[in-house]
């Protein structure tokens, strides 16, 4: 989560390296999430061949390489080699994305398995998400402090955050190396099983659900940050604190999701949170132009500063409560009753995370054409689909024998 969420504040830095559009500023997100399209199925094959532990270790090594390449891009001369710097950074983001895909493929089915599937499996996935949200909050606050004045920020300013990310990977590698993990028996991943998995209507619609869900989870904080810095002129340090609230809301939501996950069905969860997302985003878009004071920190003097922000921004931030349970609940519903297709289904599921890159491109294009606030219609459309999936698309019409 810490590494993945570096992409949004890095987009703020990139956007101020020259006359760059919102579409181009999102290259970190493109590289990070397109990697899922490339690695989704191969990651499932790695798990099948090497098991969870070795696959996780492979992913951590790959991630470390990606972080180092991004760090190298910050050492290059931006003024004379802007295109080359972007290319090197994009390669680093892509390689880091390969790592994220591998680790997600390991963690989600493992948690679901340990919980025994069903509501208990969903509960464990939500608990895992708590740790994700904690790291995301830390990432935004740290990057806001490092960026400071966004107009003057360079990729090299993010070096401390990149080194922390590298340290996380190294520590995780050491811990996992000395941890005994019970490996379930893995059936070989056969590509011809893809057609079989996709023949299940609820799974096929669920993969599209993950595709659009990524547009909500990443799109909301991403474009709130770009709006407050580019259009509203707030300092990056304050905006980092503001956007961190979104991820803090996700943290709270995941605590709640973990506590009720065994009692409330995934279908009910998605019905409630997708409806709430639609309402919150629409309010954020059409809220009165009232401003309220929000505290920030001047990291140079360590003084509290107050900035006026639009009331509707708080509505966008509350969407974090909704997205907090979406991933686990969608995954839980989509793989229900797949039997022998579950392994390949996990790989397909991870592949569809590349939807974030697509949705970021679409929303960035809309933002360039009609403005940041109007671009949130993309988020509304994504939430409407998830509501459809919860009410209709997720119904299991047939089950595979276990």
Where are these regions (language model features)?
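C-terminal ends and interior cores of transmembrane alpha-helices
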Residues: 61-82, 276-305
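Helix-loop-helix hairpin linking two adjacent transmembrane segments in secondary transporters
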Residues: 108, 121-180
């Amino acid at each position: 989560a810490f590494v993945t969420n570096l992409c949004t504040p890095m987009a703020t830095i990139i956007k101020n390296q020259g006359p760059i559009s919102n579409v181009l500023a999102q290259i970190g997100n493109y590289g990070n999430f397109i990697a899922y399209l490339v690695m989704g199925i191969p990651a499932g094959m790695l798990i099948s061949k090497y098991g969870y532990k070795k696959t996780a270790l492979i992913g951590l090594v790959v991630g470390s390489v990606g972080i180092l390449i991004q760090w190298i891009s910050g050492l290059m001369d931006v003024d004379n080699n802007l295109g080359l710097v972007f290319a090197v950074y994009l390669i680093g983001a892509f390689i880091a994305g390969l790592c994220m895909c591998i680790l997600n493929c390991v963690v989600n089915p493992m948690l679901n398995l340990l919980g025994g599937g069903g509501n208990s499996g969903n509960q464990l996935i939500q608990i895992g998400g708590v740790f994700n949200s904690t790291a995301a909050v830390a990432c935004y606050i740290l990057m806001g402090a490092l960026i400071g004045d966004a107009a003057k920020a360079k990729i090299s300013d993010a070096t401390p955050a990149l080194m922390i990310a590298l340290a996380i990977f190294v520590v995780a590698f050491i811990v996992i190396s000395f941890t005994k993990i019970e490996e379930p028996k893995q059936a070989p991943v056969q590509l011809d099983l893809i057609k079989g998995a996709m023949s299940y209507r609820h799974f096929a619609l669920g993969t599209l659900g993950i595709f659009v869900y990524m547009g909500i989870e990443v799109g909301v904080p991403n474009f709130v940050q770009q709006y407050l810095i580019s259009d509203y002129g707030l300092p990056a340090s304050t905006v980092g604190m503001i956007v961190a609230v979104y991820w803090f809301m996700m943290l709270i939501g995941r605590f709640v999701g973990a506590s009720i996950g065994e009692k409330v069905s995934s279908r009910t969860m998605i019905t409630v949170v997708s409806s709430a997302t639609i309402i919150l985003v629409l309010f954020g878009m059409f809220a009165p132009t009232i401003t309220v004071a929000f505290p920030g920190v001047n990291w140079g003097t360590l003084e509290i500063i107050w900035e006026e922000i639009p009331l509707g921004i708080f509505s966008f931030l509350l969407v974090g409560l909704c997205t907090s349970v979406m991933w686990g609940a969608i995954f839980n519903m989509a793989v229900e009753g797949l039997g022998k297709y579950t392994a390949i289904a996990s790989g397909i599921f991870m592949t569809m995370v590349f939807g974030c890159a697509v949705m970021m491109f679409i929303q960035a294009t809309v933002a360039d054409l009609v403005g940041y606030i109007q671009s949130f219609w993309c988020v509304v459309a994504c939430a409407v689909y998830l509501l459809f999936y919860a009410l209709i698309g997720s119904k299991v019409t047939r089950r595979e024998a276990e």
